[in-house]
Swiss-Prot record:
Pfam family, one: Formyl_trans_C
InterPro entries the UniProt entry points to: Fmt (IPR005794), Formyl_trans_C (IPR005793), Formyl_transf_N (IPR002376), Formyl_transf_N_sf (IPR036477), Met-tRNA-FMT_N (IPR041711)
GO molecular function terms noted in the UniProt entry: methionyl-tRNA formyltransferase activity
One Gene Ontology cellular component annotation held by this UniProt entry: mitochondrion
UniProt source species: Rattus norvegicus
Gene3D superfamilies with a match to the protein in the record: 3.40.50.12230
Protein name as it appears in the record: Methionyl-tRNA formyltransferase, mitochondrial
Protein family: Belongs to the Fmt family.
NCBIfam families associated with the record: fmt (TIGR00460)
Disulfide bridge map: none
Length: 385
């Protein structure tokens, strides 16, 4: 007979494993040890999650519960976190629509479960909580750990131009995020020019399928878990509002485009135009034919310089090393590049007829610390909406 606790690794070293014939204590704090620990499916699962990535894993668990022939999941309940959105986070929405029992952290009901599953939950789980599950808690993480530990792995994958990523199913350990043994890991190529949301859709389906595969052979998967490599550890911290402020003097055109792909769907990139905040909505790479245009090549420019390129109907903005194209912006209202030229750039040139073109420029926006902290909360909410 497999002892679930034996699979938990060195963090329980020196402790005697609990008898495998006992089920975990209930979440009400009462001792609920009347039933034996199951050696095989169907499992009783408590799911912890928040966002769209987590919702796909929950959807797969729900489908498995409803599949009476396969008998993989017998019981499925959900824990999520409070949200500033009246309708709640995607996981809560799905749970309610699917008539699954749902609790708001730290409430977890009082049921008995065999295994916990975490995806995009954002809360450290205590050792006492983990020990309530005979088979521990599994984490579905959208990166190839140990690369991109932390709350924003998909954003950092895109931001840093990774060409390969993946999903890791690992065991949760207390006190630290994303450090437990790897049970299953699969890689996938990052589609060129994909946004974080597009990549999330790919990884969420992969992760959901991997989770079901692990649950089908749970005791064996736990016994075969391997420690994460000590090399190649990187971290993916939360993104703040300040990240969206383009630093024209410091960032290359490739870095600005990656930043747009990474967070543009969530919070648009920001800059200053004549002391007014402007949001850059649609950014594109500038092709060689535009760069070869004498009207572009002949300009004396500095980082932030703005030129309207009539043939492509784009604003060209100079970064640290070259140009990036902007097709639309938000300046009081949404404007195409042509609208912005007609309403603002052309007027600037008329008013400053003797100025150098390099003086017509966007400037780096510096957000106050309080604004960054406030917007960080809103951004975290947007990431899960």
């Amino acid at each position: 007979m497999l002892l679930p606790r034996r699979c938990w690794g060195p963090w329980l070293a020196g402790r005697r494993p609990r008898c495998s014939c006992q089920s975990p204590a209930g979440f009400s704090g009462k001792d609920r040890r009347s039933s034996r620990v199951r050696e095989k499916p169907p499992w009783r699962v408590l799911f912890f999650g928040t966002d769209h990535f987590a919702r796909e894993a929950l959807r797969a668990l729900h489908a498995a519960r409803d599949n009476k022939e396969e008998k993989l999941i017998e019981k499925l309940e959900v824990v999520t976190v409070p949200s500033i959105s009246p309708k709640g986070l995607p996981v809560k929405q799905y749970a309610i629509q699917s008539q699954l029992p749902v609790y708001e952290w730290p409430d977890m009901g009082s049921g008995e479960y065999d295994v916990g599953v975490v995806a995009s939950f954002g809360r450290l789980l205590s050792e006492a909580l983990i020990l309530k599950f005979p088979y521990g808690i599994l984490n579905v993480h959208p990166s190839c750990l140990p690369r991109w530990r932390g709350p924003a792995p998909i954003i950092h994958t895109v931001l840093h131009g990774d060409t390969v990523t993946g999903v890791t199913i690992m065991q949760v350990r207390p006190k630290r995020f994303d450090v437990g043994p790897i049970l299953k890991q699969e890689t996938v190529a990052v589609p060129p020019k994909s946004t974080s949301k597009e990549l999330e859709a790919v990884l969420s389906k992969l992760g959901a399928n991997m989770l079901i595969s692990v649950l089908k052979n749970l005791p064996e998967s736990l016994n075969n878990g391997r420690p994460q490599p000590a090399e190649g550890v990187t971290y993916a911290p939360k993104v703040s509002a300040g990240t969206s402020c383009v630093k024209w003097e410091e960032q290359t055109s490739e870095q600005v485009l990656r930043l747009h792909l990474a967070i543009g769907d969530i919070v648009p990139l920001q800059t200053l135009w004549m002391e007014n905040t402007v949001k850059l909505l649609d950014l594109v790479e500038v092709n060689n034919s535009i760069l070869a245009d004498p009207k572009v090549m002949g300009q004396t420019v500095t980082p932030g310089s703005v030129v309207y390129h009539r043939p492509s109907q784009m604003l060209l903005v100079h970064c640290k090393d070259g140009w990036i194209g902007v097709r639309s912006i938000m300046h009081k209202k949404t404007l195409t590049a042509t609208d912005f030229y007609n309403g603002y750039l052309h007027a600037w040139y008329q008013k400053n007829s003797h100025a150098y073109p390099s003086q017509c420029k966007f400037q780096t926006l510096r957000l106050p610390t309080k604004t960054q902290q406030k917007t960080k909360l809103l951004l975290c909410s947007a990431l899960s909406s």
